[in-house]
Amino acid sequence: MATRFTINQQRAVEETGHNILVAASAGSGKTTVLIERLIQKILSGISVENFLIVTFTNAAAKEMRERLEIAIEKRLRDANDGMKRFLQEQLLLLPAANISTIDAYALRLIENYYHVIGLDPQFRLLSDTAERDMMRQDVLDTVFEAFYDETHPQHENFIALVNNFGNPNQDDALRQAVLKLSDFAEARPDGQQWLKELDKNDLATANGLTQSQTYRLTILPMMIARLEQLLEIAQATQTNLSGVPELKKTQQAFDEIIAYLVNVQQALVDDDWDTLRGKLSQLPKVSLETKRSKGIKDEPELLALLAQATTVKNNILGAKSDLKNVIDTFFKFDQNDWQYVEKQATELVNTLVTLTQACQSAFTTAKRDAQLVDFPDLGALALEILNDDMTRKTVSGQFQEILVDEYQDINQLQETLLTKVSNGHNMYMVGDVKQSIYGFRQAEPTLFARKYRQFALPDNPDSRIELADNFRSQNNVTRVTNLIFTQLMDEKLGDIAYTGEAKLVPKANYPTDVTPVFNMTIIKQPNVTTSEDEDESQEFEKRQAQYAQLANQILSLRDTTIFDRKAEPAGMRPVQYGDIAILTRSKTGYIDLVATLRQAGIPTQVDSVGNYFQTMEVYLMLDVLRVIDNPHQDIPLAAILRSPMFGYSENDLAAVRLADKKHDYWSALTVFAQADQRSQTVIDLIKKWHQLAIQNDLVALIWAIFDDTSWLDYVAGMPGGAQRQANLHALYDYARTYQENTHAGLFRFIRYIEQLQENDGQLGEAPQEANEQAVRIMTIHASKGLEFPIVFLPEFDKSFNTQDLSGKMLIQKNAGIGLEYLQPEALVAMPTLKKLTVQQALKRQSWSEEMRLLYVALTRAEQQIYVVGTVKLDENEENQRLIALWQRAKETSGQFLAEDLRLSAKSYFDWLLISLARTKNDDLESWLGDGHLPHVLGPETTLDSQISVRFINESDVVIPEPQGNETKEITRASTYQAEDFARAKAILDYQYPFQQATRTAAYQSVSEMKRLFEDPDRANLKTLNVLENGQLQPANELVSDKLVLPTFMTDGSQKPSSAAVGTATHLMLQLLDFKQIQTHQSLTALRDDLVTQGRLTAPVAALIDIDQILNFLQTPFAQRLCLHADSLRREATFAMIMPANQIYEHVHDQASVLVHGIIDGYFIDKKTKSITLFDYKTDFVRHGRVEEDISKMMVRYRGQLTLYKQALMQEFPDYTFYEPQLIILNVGRVIPITTK
């Protein structure tokens, strides 16, 4: 059935001839529209070679390519002959099409045009982050050492900079500042120019601080906005007080407050810094009536009015008020003092820029000397290539259209690069600025926002197309999202006004009887005065309570139903664990979360529970490597001895220590080994491994450790053994990749691993197969682009991360750089005025991104959202803070809540509260409100959503027990009865009903069972038959008359068997890289490598028919394998249980038989949820009887492929299976087999 597009979707598919920005909100069918646009252009005769399609992750690029392939194949079925040939050609061109990340495209440009910029074509991409970081650290060491030299011209300035950030013995903070500054510059097309202009601080040079651009553009707008909000609240309070004679004193107080605010407001514009500072400091000292004042104490309405006025007064003039905080920070010093500090800081910035440029230059030189190019180089070098006019015209002429997916995540350098590739009117940009959540990667959402405004102007030739219809979420999810963001997100905070066309429009088709669910659970934590250690314990208990609440809610959902809109036909069904996702801001606490859910019997799937390097099996291997590198390290040596690898007890370790108390532990072990053979064996092993390390063969070293200690086998027997083995194999792979790229030794590898740990690289445990019936746990970042029927959002009360707002140096793309200045004589550190302004800009930027993360989290849900947070309702300070937020939000007029109110939020929970303050929520109003009716919401906000709020005590939350595990009390009879003896006799006389099955193997391989489906070797092997007396012959299924002669009894002249050649051919096909174009030369090289590695013997290798393999690779099926190379699985082992009577014709028992085997290969198409398996055959086919022999092979192997298919169907029950393909290499044919 053809997709029915909306008017705007159709515009997005068809419109052309100019630049187009498609603003595609969550769930609007963006990818479907993009693919349809591409397929329509292809059908019009434009080749895929003429598109440049870029996105921001390899996974997204892969998905785009796969979807386009499916779309072309779909059109191919109904195409006429001419179009069919063209579409088939497009399928062949698709693997090489320009569908990639921007970095990958830049790399392709460099590989093709390296000569334009004089780059050595033999360069290698430095893709390993840890390796790059190590190289940068080495360069920093060299450059810093040069600057520390007293003869260096910048030495004195450098020392002043070092002392400002720390001291010569502790310059880590300065090193990090240099790297951070360099990273910022590398993400800009004008990076070097930007660096040079950083020391232009107009606060230091302006004729008066209030005349500086920084004041006019940053400090003044901030102060004006805050004063306007305070003035509005004060005036509203004064209005409420008018006509109330009992509160005359309070009225007079607010007259003074308003006069003060108006006076300061004017002074901000008119006065110089010192005059303004003086006026700000003259806070009015006012007093109000008290609760016991005459005529008030017995009047509830007057008491409520007085309480409101008191709160407002404290919010304006109180010691902890926002205004008082601004005065104490920004206006701490007079103009002379501030400008002195700014001038000193400017000199430090100048030195910092010089140092950074020196490090950048040295790093570039080091990379070129080593023939390396890193990821930041890619964009810069590609841009340098495109600065050549002739090259730019050549490149630009290749593309009819440039399509940019996820355009909101682009940075300035990437934008400049793509603009140069375009012809000025063929850019097609798709994205949603509301989902720009990659600021830490230098993403620049303002680029999208700028075009969003400009492309909507009537005189602009380019166009903006809005896709606001949401086809994902049930109406209540969409309406709650709109309720929240029409009050929170505007151009100042969020980079787009969430109004009009930017709002979501509910368009998903759900039955009217689907219950709308937006559940907000607030866990009340008792307020207990605690020490710092107890605070940590209380924080842990808070998380545990939330996780337990999640478990309870998830278990309660098992008895409910959801609407499955993707089923055929769509309809209601019970909730499954796979319908549920838990989204978090970070991975902190994942170990506890998973443990809690598993304790409740809830299966989970999580990308990464913890740091890979902290797993026991890997950590121990790293200690072994440290000891091999340097055995005189007591802690690693003691650790490996005490570990299961060597099994020393505490007493053993003590005995070793007593053997030599004066020297290190290795010396003691050496002495102890003279009388202890086990210790001598350990020493011999370490020395053996050390010799391997000297040879710089990391791969052989790690495998030798595995082999000599059986460590791989040991961990397999531990809980989670498969995962532990996967982790160790991953370590082996890290070592192999590192060795291939660097050829460095063990010491550098250990340092490389430590660099990964220091950088908190968050290497997750080695991935296992996905469990589709498990609760998914992931970060909000990882959930982007996904959708789930039910979404849980725990820890909504968790404070925003403010780490980027602190530190000795702050950088913001527009505000520049701000330092903390250390006064050298007094050794007093203070933030400069510039740093304070940068901090404000950074906070606005950070809070904007947090707001967009909240939007992404809410819009992942299809039907139900559960929010969980914890508050200390009994803690007066926190309670008063939340009440103040609620009251201010209630009193806000207009569409959006006040900017400073939104900025004062500390968590998502705060934002959720203030967005509900003007709605009629009795539960929250009874907690935070004062009984006054809420103000009317803005015209863009509607009250058509349903939100349920409930409070529970932390002490009432318990982790549920898994169902079915109840402990039953067992009682024992005190005397034997007659029936006990009858039962005993029945047991003794018991006849096993599956006696026949005991004479068949309960563990069968498919190769042993092939005979049952016409085995090809049946003429050479005896088969198991039922004897004439009906008894089964107790033997293996297939037995040979003769045993193969061992090698030492042969003269070596025996010709390799056809089976050996077939096995060798299978090995080559197993290792073949389907992502690369294969030639006779490359296949021969692969065969020869296998001989060199000892995996094939030369006589066998000589008989492998390379031409047969090449002929197969030319088949259409082989091309499909190339297109699905990423999802290709080869040599896949399986095991399954089958009833014996389904396997053996003469056995009638239903006893279970374990069948195991190895499937040559299969590939998965995740888009269509389909699987195609295949099997290689090297059987001889007679030239004159090809069809006859193929027919026999189809019959012969049908049973075998049936078993393979059944095994995969058990593993992938929800997937469609196409006919298995029998690949007959002898004639280069691929035959589909109809299975039973």
Curated annotation (Swiss-Prot):
SUPFAM superfamilies listed in its UniProt record: P-loop containing nucleoside triphosphate hydrolases, Restriction endonuclease-like
Coiled-coil segments: none
GO molecular function: 3'-5' DNA helicase activity; 3'-5' exonuclease activity; ATP binding; ATP hydrolysis activity; double-stranded DNA binding
Signal peptide: none
GO cellular component: cytosol; DNA helicase complex
Catalytic activity reported: Couples ATP hydrolysis with the unwinding of duplex DNA by translocating in the 3'-5' direction; ATP + H2O = ADP + phosphate + H(+)
UvrD-like helicase ATP-binding domain: residues covered: 3-474
Subunit composition and interactions: Heterodimer of AddA and AddB/RexB.
Family from the record: Belongs to the helicase family. AddA subfamily.
Protein name, entry field: ATP-dependent helicase/nuclease subunit A
Name of the coding gene: addA
